[in-house]
Amino acid sequence: MGMRCIVLEANRIGWGASGRNGGIAVPRYKLTYPELEKRYGREVAELMYRAAHEAVGVLEGIVQHYSLDCGFVRSGHLTPMVSANDAERFSADVKWLESVFGDRAPRVLDRATTARKTGTSFYACAYHEPRGAAIHPLEYCATLAHALHARAVQIHCDTPVTAWHASHSGVVLDTPRGRVHCKQLVIATNGYSDLTPAGRLLSKRVVPVASAVIATEPLPPQVRKEMLPDGEPATDAKRLTNYYRVLRDGSFFFGGRGGASSSASQRIYDRLRRDMVAIFPQLQSVPTRHQWFGMVAVTLDTLPHIGSLDQRVHYGMGYNGRGVALSALFGKQLANQVAGNAPSLGPMSGGWFQAIPFHAFRVPAKHVAISWKQMADSFGL
């Protein structure tokens, strides 16, 4: 017997990061697998490897099960890099995967192959993961919502939860449009947890960081042939990451961290375009068509977290820019958790997800962190 579910959306479907992201699904975390082993041990690193690959598989399974027209493709994924330190990190990752799992799929590409696959000579090498995927995130949200609505799942947009409290029979949620009584509550507010007072208990456990995006006009045919010719999206290895892909209409999508504030000024977009042209000089004369930004939820340990505040209130959040696939996995695991089966995802579900110290000073702290990361990227640290 299934569960009767109601979705309360503060704005409209896909308004937040779920619709604004880069649509890149890759079976990786911010840390490499040897780094995860060093921090948590071999057994946990192996568990997290399996979870990361399961996450992309769950996303693909949802698309196939509901026949969603959202551009999902197992495109592969590139992590280009310029620093020798990053090359060492990812070379160690390749060796670890082969040694521990016999996984020979990922490899580090040389400069010439990287230049051919990316369309630029900017990088020294790249980590190639052939099992990565790409998707149109807003189309995914919209078509999934339509499929669920057709299966009698109630979705109420423009219905922010302003408060919630436990009752003798479950949880009571207050909204401007009425009150909802439920047996179990799942909070999935991520980088927008401070949007209403109801999410502020969890908002202190993540730091929202703006990520800005520009999209060009469709590329001229000759330029289009050069840019990521094998259709693989890319996320570079810098601390202040850039991510990019060629979209289905032939336009070029380029994103990067948008600064410490919760908004993106024109200065941010101008800097993003300068970064894009520095990497891809052939885009100098291609106009920008669209620009937007959204919030990424960052955690202290760079990992997302799934857990419960009590037996009736659950959460999944803090994806650190890896939420396209991992949020699909967390959705599956949250359903199991609501049904009474706690997930086993190592440090992502181990119960440690505390408030960030001095959270009230997060904006000046972000300025300091961004400046340090910019310096580290400049020196290839």
Give the location of each predicted region.
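Dinucleotide-binding Rossmann-like beta1-alpha1 core, especially the glycine-rich loop
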Residues: R28-A112
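Active-site substrate-recognition segment that forms the wall
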Residues: G57, H65-R74, V161-A163, H168-S169, ...
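General small-molecule cofactor/ligand-binding pocket signal
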Residues: P106-D110, Q154-H156, R289-Q291
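Glycine-rich FAD pyrophosphate-binding loop
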Residues: M1-R20
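Helix-loop-beta segment of a Rossmann-like dinucleotide-binding subdomain
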Residues: R42, D69-T79, T113-A147, R151, ...
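Hydrophobic anchor at the start of a short beta-strand
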Residues: C5, P106, V286
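C-terminal catalytic lobe of FAD-dependent flavoproteins
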Residues: F254, G258-F379
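Helical element adjacent to the flavin cofactor pocket in flavoenzyme catalytic cores
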Residues: E88-V100, S121-Q184
